[in-house]
């Protein structure tokens, strides 16, 4: 657990290690004021395009050889029960647990992004050589556009 203040912004965080929950490091953060993001600095918004096509991260797909066991660890960590499809739902995002789809073992298979225009994303990814099997694929992780 850590806390840091700079200027008018205070950030608090706790990290959950993969050894405890499986699959990924999870960072749970709280900023005051709520729209600040201290970890990126006090002026981070100046570096973000106001016309950006990306709207938000709306989900993550976790893969495992034992998706039910992994899901149970995450349920316990977040204090939330998954539905019958092994999906933990939050107010504006979700975590889906699936079988090991690419034989890389337990971990993040994909991030789900809400975007304004999928075609623009796919064109840019193709131009940059970031597609694999028809998906946007960066650093071993797929990016699924919603």
Tell where the protein language model's regions lie, with residue ranges.
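Vicinal oxygen chelate
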Residues: 1-55, 59, 83, 87-104, ...
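A generic structural signal for alpha-helix starts
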Residues: 65-69, 116-119
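Amphipathic alpha-helical segments
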Residues: 66-81, 124
């Amino acid at each position: 657990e850590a806390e840091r203040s700079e200027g008018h912004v205070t950030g608090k965080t706790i990290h959950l290690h993969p050894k405890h929950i499986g699959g990924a490091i999870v960072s749970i953060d709280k900023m005051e004021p709520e729209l600040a993001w201290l970890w990126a600095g006090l002026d981070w918004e100046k570096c973000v395009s106001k016309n950006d096509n990306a709207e938000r991260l709306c989900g993550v797909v976790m893969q495992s050889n034992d998706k039910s066991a992994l899901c149970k660890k995450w349920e316990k960590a977040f204090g939330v029960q998954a539905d019958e499809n092994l999906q933990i739902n939050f107010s504006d995002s979700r975590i889906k647990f699936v079988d090991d789809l690419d034989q890389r073992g337990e971990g993040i298979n994909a991030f789900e992004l809400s975007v304004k225009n999928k075609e623009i994303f796919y064109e840019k990814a193709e131009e940059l050589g970031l597609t694999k099997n028809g998906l946007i694929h960066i650093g071993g992780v797929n990016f699924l556009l919603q």
